[in-house]
Amino acid sequence: MTRNLQGLDRRAFLKTSAAGAAGLWVGFHLHEPLEALAAGETGTAPVALNAWVHVGTDDLVTIFIDKSEMGQSILTGLAMIAAEELDCNWKKVRTEFAPADKAYVNPWFGVQGTGASSATRTSWDPLRKAGAAARMMLLEAAAQKWGVDKSECRAESGTVLHAATGRRASYGSLAQAAAKLPIPSDVPLKDPKQYRIVGKPTKRLDTPLKVNGSAQYGIDVRQPGMLYAIVARCPVFGGKVASFDAAKAKATPGVKHVIQISNGVAIVADNTWTAMEGRHALEVKWDEGPNVSASSGSISKLFAERAAKPGYVARKEGDAEAALGHAAKKIEAVYEVPFLAHATMEPQNCTAHVRADRCDVWAPTQAQTSAQATAAEAAGLKPEAVFIHTTFLGGGFGRRFEADFVREAVEISKAIGSPVKVTWSREDDLQHDYYRPASYARFAAGLDADGWPVAWINRIACPSIMARFGPLKDNFDSRSVEICDSIPYDIPNILVDYQVADPGIPVGFWRSVGASQNGFFLESFIDEVATAGKKDPYELRRRLLAKSPRHLAVLETAAQKAGWGAPLPTGHFRGIATVTSYFGFVAQVVEISVDRGKRELKVLRVVCALDCGRAVNPSSLEAQVQSSVVYGLTAALRSAITIDRGRVQQTNFNDYPVLRIHEMPAVDVHIMPSQLPPTGAGEFTVPPVAPALCNAIFAATGRRVRRLPIRAEDLA
């Protein structure tokens, strides 16, 4: 079970959550020892807490989750971590979304947010300590009740047992007594050999809610007296309203308001369809601004010009230019990828209710405190007066780290004095995104007389994601060269540099961020190096990764499981790629069939070996890898955002297609055993998909794919 909390104030948070179920509360700070305790109505609200465990007198255990659930099963995974150390009955566990508060700030981002495969990694230690603290307090409560030493008691599946006397007590019966005890400053954590929850394939806690329809997504929110809004936005990036005539829109039956907001003109109506009809009737003249001449062609030209010049040096080992000059053989290549939209299944939406002293926001957000700050600014209130109610997310992929849809809803609600839901159409969503940056990469490599690489030069030009958040030091954005600046291959001379190229198209975080395009660049070109040196692509990688044991292990596992080197059926071909990013290691082998006469490609199988530390829930991890394959194949085979006259040309899934069910290959997932802390898997398993696929196409056709998405001529 999962529900939302309706407030920010910690004391109110506790009272609301514990209504009718007094018991043991344990909270803890991310960076400090365990601290503070709240016991229902009678306890004191803890300060700067990061997450919570509540053991109710009814034996229910509630884990409060400060992360966003967008399909990755984080509700279940984080609950498993706390429940393991608590030693509770898993069937008695439920979860609740925590409110927005600085106490929950993700140390990676500086905001409360979910992304970069950080949710499990940053919660692993705090949640284990919270669960263990609650367990120790329950043991102490039982020991005091029975007049025995705590060391004689043990916890098991929601019960404390005293073996010598056979006495037993449920957690619920001990909760109130435990709540009166101090939180221990140091708690013993389980030996992983004792784990009975973590590491076991576990069904998702939110599946029943999604099956019966009770899971609330942002698009499902309803509030008393709520109106519905659609926003007309300038089709050209950077444009704004010059003037508008609202007469025809206001004449549409059911339209209540037509108002200008910072991002365009809002039509407010009795329902979303009527608001859309009102937008169709609205007459707007746009000031199209400075980007009206931008096109995909001009952007590509800009990138090529920038990449031809030296830029900020992101990595330098040895003297790559001199080594290239003395190499026995030289190869060069240029790679290019387009802008990409996020295309979340649930389009952007937000419901807001602004009053004189309070603002409530219901949003499918990945960044609660950013949404809170944006809403506070738009409402003219302090952040403490803004209450963020996080819903389930119908996909995130980084898009919902933005707060543009929150600002719109708050501005409209403030203007009309009523709660309002803003809904984006699919066309709005595709044409007003913060896109994965288009990128351009030049490569040069030098080989010795035996065909091994001795020089590697990589120049990248693309927009900066981080530039809109503040000035770039030395005009450098590390996300733009992500993984290219940390190339794992043992090559003695390496030079990687970067040039910012800003064509005026808004860019943002997209699943795996810079690694998404740079994985394609790097792993495609290393395949070219193997071919030029007359090496097997797998064997070349093996030798160059000899000093990187975790990376080498996933490479060897993927190759072995895929049968690398074994004969394939006629017309079948393989490609391989391996990437490390977001603290994870992954290798993939893609098997395809190609009909060169018809220029048709079928992806048959993807074999994936990954090392992400300890696997908390292997079944969810496998699902994450499968979804990464879908996302990676969609980007490689189908997707491109193209620009003409400063406008996005794509409108819906008819011209921005995604992978269909019948196109989905078999995906074999092999999780490497590990005793290391978990990292997460939502990001790093995306980047190898495209290069492994394109390397398989080269094996089939002898043609290199250096530009995505793949075209029919690449299969000839």
Where are these regions (language model features)?
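Cofactor-binding beta-sheet edge motifs in enzyme active sites
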Residues: 2-30, 37-716
